[in-house]
Amino acid sequence: MTNIRKTHPLMKIVNNAFIDLPAPSNISSWWNFGSLLGICLMLQILTGLFLAMHYTSDTATAFSSVTHICRDVNYGWIIRYMHANGASMFFICLFMHVGRGLYYGSYMFLETWNIGVILLFATMATAFMGYVLPWGQMSFWGATVITNLLSAIPYIGTNLVEWIWGGFSVDKATLTRFFAFHFILPFIIMALAMVHLLFLHETGSNNPTGISSDVDKIPFHPYYTIKDILGALLLILALMLLVLFTPDLLGDPDNYTPANPLNTPPHIKPEWYFLFAYAILRSIPNKLGGVLALVLSILILVLMPLLHTSKQRSMMFRPISQCLFWILVADLLTLTWIGGQPVEHPYIIIGQLASIMYFLLILILMPTASTIENNLLKW
């Protein structure tokens, strides 16, 4: 009798995706982040569901309801902090996952890569709206500043902002709709993640060498299931260390002050995972220019397959490109630091230089380095 997992219509899908899937024999731990992102997403949906049971999306009670969750609900504090810090772990995994894709040339799987970029945008939108929900000072002013950026769009900008706000400022209507969107988006992300996997399984995984691994495949289970379990344990360990020892490490103290439209905090800044993009936005003195640079800083990922000039797919055997890749990582860390600093000398000029460097590296230096490497190998 044939095994049920190979015949049952539903089990067959699971089997072909997670059990009998032919996987390259040499994929490293950098390939763990896909499954870790799946775990993060499930964790966020579960903790978010339990938070939504006690949260009220009204300006008068939102802040109090979060306090109530932390003080009065059974283990409410741990659910709240797992959700808040879970978002940080989610973005750490996301950045590692995208970085892996850039380093090893995974962007050559066009459909998978483009769905991935859409997933990144959707996750950023979800995280932004989630940050507004506790209705603290940084929630309110963050929402005001970021939504206001849309007013830079010529002709329709102002109308668009007021339409999103549901009034003439960030208020009840804004909070309610942000809660609705924050609830629905993770399920859209889950559906997109399935499409992401569907496209990936059309081609099979890439591997560190960037060379076809069709000649040397191993079954996903037990080899990579056990590897993913180890990754998951380390992820949960890191998350719980954060939650149980320093739950507010990555948060902003201003968010423990209830939202007050009459009092602007001295330094308005988003969560740490948006700081690099925020620094790029602030480094351009023009409003529309800043917004365009902000969007392009992420949208530039879509251009990666077009900017690939090397005859090799991966950077594994390309030392000049490797060097530039790590300079790009250092540049992004610099931008993250600058995004959290006040707008004054010397931070302004450092931010502007780091922003120029970011686009210069991706658009000019890395493709040039690839061409030089081709010539060095007489290709």
Swiss-Prot record:
Its main location: mitochondrion. This is Cytochrome b. The keyword rRNA-binding does not apply. Component of the ubiquinol-cytochrome c reductase complex (complex III or cytochrome b-c1 complex) that is part of the mitochondrial respiratory chain. The b-c1 complex mediates electron transfer from ubiquinol to cytochrome c. Contributes to the generation of a proton gradient across the mitochondrial membrane that is then used for ATP synthesis. The lineage of its organism: Eukaryota, Metazoa, Chordata, Craniata, Vertebrata. A ubiquinone binds at residue 201. The cytochrome bc1 complex contains 11 subunits: 3 respiratory subunits (MT-CYB, CYC1 and UQCRFS1), 2 core proteins (UQCRC1 and UQCRC2) and 6 low-molecular weight proteins (UQCRH/QCR6, UQCRB/QCR7, UQCRQ/QCR8, UQCR10/QCR9, UQCR11/QCR10 and a cleavage product of UQCRFS1). This cytochrome bc1 complex then forms a dimer. It is a multi-pass membrane protein. It comes from Redunca fulvorufula (Mountain reedbuck). Heme 1 (or BL or b562) is low-potential and absorbs at about 562 nm, and heme 2 (or BH or b566) is high-potential and absorbs at about 566 nm. Belongs to the cytochrome b family.
